Structures are given as structure tokens and as C-alpha cells.
Amino acid sequence: MNPAHLLILAAVCVSPLGAFSNRPMPLNLYQFKNMIQCTVPNRSWWDFADYGCYCGRGGSGTPVDDLDRCCQVHDNCYNEAEKISRCWPYFKTYSYECSQGTLTCKGDNDACAAAVCDCDRLAAICFAGAPYNNNNYNIDLKARCQ
């Protein structure tokens, strides 16, 4: 095989791998981040990524407060959405609007997208109504979330 052809073939095969490994987060989580910023504009979305027992990766034990309970409900909502055929909430994108702190899931979403959008919308609204306790950020999960 011609060396130039090998080089092109290698570039085509390697490029998609690089694109996937460099993606910062699934697109749905990017949308969820934007929903949070819509309802809670004065706080970084990152403040919710490692809060309590349920906000962030995984979840176990008793929620530490109302905000953590919002995340527990969101986790359960995603679990319900996964029951829809071929629905993967962390990767499902959807259509929505944010207008002056109000979130609306659009009507053109399929069943999975509508469910995931509503999960994210309700969580973002819940975050806006729950007090944020700095002492519950980055807690010791083993000690407090059994």
C-alpha cells in the first residue's frame, strides 16, 4: 500500500478517537448545566457537581438537605427515563428555552428527550428554591452517605 494512503487512513481512524476523548462532557450534561445557569445565575453550575450525597457521581444514603434531595429526585427521574426504549439520559439531547429564569421543554422532543428535559428542568427549578450550604460541598461520602 502507498505510504500516503496509510497516512490518510491512520488520520481518519485516529481523528474520531481524539474527538471522543477530548469531549468535556456529554451534550446532555452541557444542556443541564445551562438550565442550572438559567435558574441559578449567581452561582456556578460547578457548585452542584460535588454537593451532598447525590449531586454529582452516584448517590447513596440519606440526602443531607433539600438541595441534595433535589439531586436524589433527579437521579430517580433519570432512572425512570431509562425505562423508555433506547433512552440514555446522560447522552440524550433535547429542545428547551430559557427566558428570564423560566425553563420550557419544547413540544418537538421525542418521548425520551421530553422525559430527560423535564428531569433536568425540574431539578434546575428545585436548585433555585433550595438553600445552598457550603458545608455540604465536597463532603466525606463514606462518613456521611451510608
From Swiss-Prot:
Binding-site residues for Ca(2+), renumbered to this chain: 54, 56, 58, 75
Compartment(s) where it occurs, according to its Swiss-Prot or TrEMBL record: Secreted
Tissue expression pattern: Expressed by the venom gland.
Cofactor binding remark: Binds 1 Ca(2+) ion.
GO BP: arachidonate secretion; fatty acid biosynthetic process; lipid catabolic process; phospholipid metabolic process; positive regulation of fibroblast proliferation
Give GO MF terms, alphabetically: acetylcholine receptor inhibitor activity; calcium ion binding; calcium-dependent phospholipase A2 activity; phospholipid binding; signaling receptor binding; toxin activity
Cystine pairings recorded for this chain: 38-98, 53-145, 55-71, 70-126, 77-119, 87-112, 105-117
**Cofactor(s) the protein requires to work:** Ca(2+)
Q: Pro-sequence positions in this chain?
A: 22-27
What's the catalysed reaction? a 1,2-diacyl-sn-glycero-3-phosphocholine + H2O = a 1-acyl-sn-glycero-3-phosphocholine + a fatty acid + H(+)
> What's the EC number here?
3.1.1.4
Q: Which domain of life is it from?
A: Eukaryota
Keywords carried by this UniProt record: Acetylcholine receptor inhibiting toxin, Calcium, Disulfide bond, Hydrolase, Lipid degradation, Lipid metabolism, Metal-binding, Neurotoxin, Postsynaptic neurotoxin, Secreted, Signal, Toxin
One GO cellular component this record assigns the protein to is: extracellular region
Signal peptide start-end? 1-21
Give the positions the UniProt entry annotates as the active site: 74, 120
Please describe what this protein does. PLA2 catalyzes the calcium-dependent hydrolysis of the 2-acyl groups in 3-sn-phosphoglycerides. Is able to suppress the acetylcholine (ACh)-evoked current mediated by alpha-7 (CHRNA7)-similar nAChRs in L.stagnalis neurons (IC(50)=37 nM) and to compete with alpha-bungarotoxin for binding to muscle- and alpha-7 neuronal nAChR types, as well as to AChBPs.
Give the family per the record: Belongs to the phospholipase A2 family. Group I subfamily. D49 sub-subfamily.
Listed name of the protein? Acidic phospholipase A2 CM-II
